[in-house]
Design a protein with these regions (language model features):
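Bacterial N-terminal signal peptides that target proteins for export
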Residues: 1-7
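Cleavable N-terminal signal peptides
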Residues: 8-9, 19
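Sec/Tat signal peptide C-region and signal peptidase I cleavage site
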Residues: 15-21
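Exposed acidic/polar residues on beta-strands and adjacent loops within beta-sheet cores, strongest
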Residues: 21-174
Length: 174
């Protein structure tokens, strides 16, 4: 009986670590962070605890959005840069993106944009040109969220405009 208990304990210790691993375990600054995140299980604990656990990465939770019943996006500051993860309902990181720097004059956006005056069917993640007081604002860089494939897909910003209401930069892009 003791041998069986010892064997079970050894199996648990050998396999238990991967079961509790999250997307930040084994992550290192200076590596291909999106590639390292994809396919990993998302951390599911309190953000404060995750930030503390991975302090060496400069980890900071920046918020998230529910894209659909099947998919969420979560923004993290990792190693001094912002990354966005697409996480499925099972908690797997399906895609990750290094998000460009954004500011008051180049605000971050998430939502529905227009091309030629018509709403696009996909949710767009973008950096906008906030140098004017116009609404909607033109797009500098953008990705659509392919909900079926759970991927970020680059899209041309040419002729694309997005309303100020979807700006997610803290200062609102004003």
């Amino acid at each position: 009986m003791t041998k069986l208990a010892g064997l079970l304990a050894a199996i648990f210790l050998a396999w238990g670590q991967p079961a509790f691993a999250d997307e930040f375990q084994n992550l290192q600054c200076g590596t291909d962070i999106p590639k390292a995140l994809i396919g990993k299980r998302s951390s599911n604990g309190p953000i404060v605890e995750t930030e503390k656990k991975y302090r060496a990465l400069g980890l900071k939770g920046l918020g998230g959005d529910e894209i659909s019943d099947q998919l969420s996006s979560v923004n993290w500051l990792i190693c001094g840069a912002e990354y966005v993860e697409l996480i499925d309902r099972r908690g797997l990181v399906r895609d990750a993106l290094l998000f460009p720097p954004h500011s008051k004059t180049a605000p971050a956006f998430s939502g529905i944009c227009q091309a030629k005056g018509r709403d696009l069917p996909d949710i767009i993640l973008a950096v906008l040109d906030g140098s004017t007081a116009a609404d909607p604002l033109p797009v500098k860089t953008a990705w659509k969220i392919d909900q079926k494939g759970a991927k970020f897909v680059p899209v041309s910003g040419e002729g694309l405009t997005c309303p100020r209401g979807g700006i997610i930069t803290l200062d609102g892009g004003r």
